[in-house]
C-alpha cells in the first residue's frame, strides 16, 4: 500500500548560490557518509550531487508527510547507492516501509521522486 509520494525539482544555480553564500550549506544537507563522497568529486559534479541529494531529501520529506522541519531533518535522511549504482534511502524515523527513489539532473535542474510503500505487518 502506498504511504506517500513526493516530488521535488531544484535549480542547480540556486544550490550553487546557496553553497557559495552559506559556508556550511553542504554540511547541513549531507550526512557524514554523503560528505565523504561529495569531497571526492570535481566542482561541477559537487553541485550536481548536492542538488540531487537536496531534491531527493525534499521529495522524501513530502512523501513522509512532514516536510523538512522539527520532525524530520536533512540529517535524518541518507541517500546511498547499491552495487549497481541505484540510489536508495535510509531514514532512522521510518520503519516497516519500502522507499523507492529516482534522482535525475540536467544542465540546469535536479529532480527526484520518492514513493514510500507501507509493508504489511
UniProtKB/Swiss-Prot annotation:
Changing residue 5 to R: Loss of activity; no trimer formation. Its main location: cytoplasm. Mg(2+) binds at residues 8, 58. It holds the Pfam family ACPS. Its EC number is 2.7.8.7. InterPro entries: 4-PPantetheinyl_Trfase_dom, 4-PPantetheinyl_Trfase_dom_sf, ACPS, P-Pant_transferase_sf, Ppantetheine-prot_Trfase_dom. Changing residue 2 to A: 6% of wild-type activity. It is found in: Cytoplasm. GO terms for cellular component: cytosol. GO terms for biological process: fatty acid biosynthetic process; lysine biosynthetic process via aminoadipic acid. Its cofactor is Mg(2+). GO terms for molecular function: holo-[acyl-carrier-protein] synthase activity; magnesium ion binding. It is an enzyme of class 2 (transferase). Keywords: Cytoplasm, Fatty acid biosynthesis, Fatty acid metabolism, Lipid biosynthesis, Lipid metabolism, Magnesium, Metal-binding, Transferase. It catalyses: apo-[ACP] + CoA = holo-[ACP] + adenosine 3',5'-bisphosphate + H(+). Belongs to the P-Pant transferase superfamily. AcpS family. Transfers the 4'-phosphopantetheine moiety from coenzyme A to a Ser of fatty acid acyl-carrier-protein ACP. Also modifies the D-alanyl carrier protein but fails to recognize PCP and AcpK, an acyl carrier protein of secondary metabolism. PANTHER family: L-AMINOADIPATE-SEMIALDEHYDE DEHYDROGENASE-PHOSPHOPANTETHEINYL TRANSFERASE, PHOSPHOPANTETHEINE TRANSFERASE. Homotrimer. This is Holo-[acyl-carrier-protein] synthase. It comes from Bacillus subtilis (strain 168). The gene is acpS.
Amino acid at each position: 500500500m502506498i504511504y506517500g509520494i513526493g516530488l521535488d525539482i531544484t535549480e542547480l544555480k540556486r544550490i550553487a548560490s546557496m553553497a557559495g553564500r552559506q559556508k556550511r550549506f553542504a554540511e547541513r544537507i549531507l550526512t557524514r557518509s554523503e560528505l565523504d563522497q561529495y569531497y571526492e568529486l570535481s566542482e561541477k559534479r559537487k553541485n550536481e550531487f548536492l542538488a540531487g541529494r537536496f531534491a531527493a531529501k525534499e521529495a522524501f520529506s513530502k512523501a513522509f508527510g512532514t516536510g523538512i522541519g522539527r520532525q524530520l531533518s536533512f540529517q535524518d535522511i541518507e541517500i546511498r547507492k547499491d552495487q549497481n549504482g541505484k540510489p536508495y534511502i535510509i531514514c532512522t524515523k521510518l520503519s516497516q516501509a519500502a522507499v523507492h527513489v529516482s534522482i535525475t539532473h540536467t544542465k540546469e535542474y535536479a529532480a527526484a521522486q520518492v514513493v514510500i510503500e507501507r509493508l504489511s505487518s
